[in-house]
């Protein structure tokens, strides 16, 4: 008797803009062909200017975010300074690598704004860290990345980037059964994080 392996679906993406960073993930939580939830949250605030967005098992995402947030709070308390985006991504990479024999089944994008400006890092389940200007992870990423590559510009404003995010999600949701139900956005600037939502037509 064959046993089918089900992987959770998702589309998650991030873009660096001239005045900040946007992280976004759609809300559908699916497992194989079954939609478990239509309101799953896959974007997470880590600090006042740093966030993360994930694709994969929601339980793994949640525990990883709790762990990272706790370590960052300890770091901020002990050093009396805020952790940067790169150091937050490296901390998360270290936690992922520690679990490489039994990895968290999640692909993660960490982004935010610090003294170096806006930045974005992509992490795989084993802790590899890649910095980029835009990224997409999850089952719908192959579709979304095509839109990002054709529409992304280095000097985009937040408002222009929101339109690119909407276009990428519309394309991904039209073809990927694991993605849908609208999206949650984290918009990060030097002034803080704003949360918004996006509805698909």
Place the predicted regions along the sequence by residue.
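Long, low-complexity N-terminal extensions
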Residues: 1-201
């Amino acid at each position: 008797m064959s046993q089918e392996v089900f992987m959770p679906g998702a589309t998650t993406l991030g873009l660096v803009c001239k005045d900040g960073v946007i992280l976004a993930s759609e809300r559908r939580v699916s497992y194989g062909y079954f939609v478990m939830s239509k309101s799953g949250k896959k974007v997470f605030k880590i600090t006042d200017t740093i966030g993360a967005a994930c694709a994969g098992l929601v339980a793994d995402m949640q525990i990883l975010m709790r762990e990272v947030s706790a370590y960052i709070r300890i770091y901020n308390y002990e050093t009396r300074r805020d952790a940067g985006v790169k150091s937050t991504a490296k901390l998360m990479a270290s936690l992922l690598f520690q679990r490489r024999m039994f990895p968290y089944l999640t692909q993660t994008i960490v982004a935010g704004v610090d003294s170096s400006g806006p930045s974005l890092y992509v992490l795989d389940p084993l802790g590899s860290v890649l910095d980029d200007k835009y990224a997409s992870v999850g089952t719908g990423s192959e579709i979304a990345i095509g839109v990002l590559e054709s529409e992304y510009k280095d000097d985009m404003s937040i408002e222009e980037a929101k339109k690119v995010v909407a276009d990428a999600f519309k394309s991904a949701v039209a073809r990927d059964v694991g993605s849908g139900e609208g999206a949650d956005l984290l918009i990060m600037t030097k002034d803080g994080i704003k949360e918004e939502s996006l509805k698909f037509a």
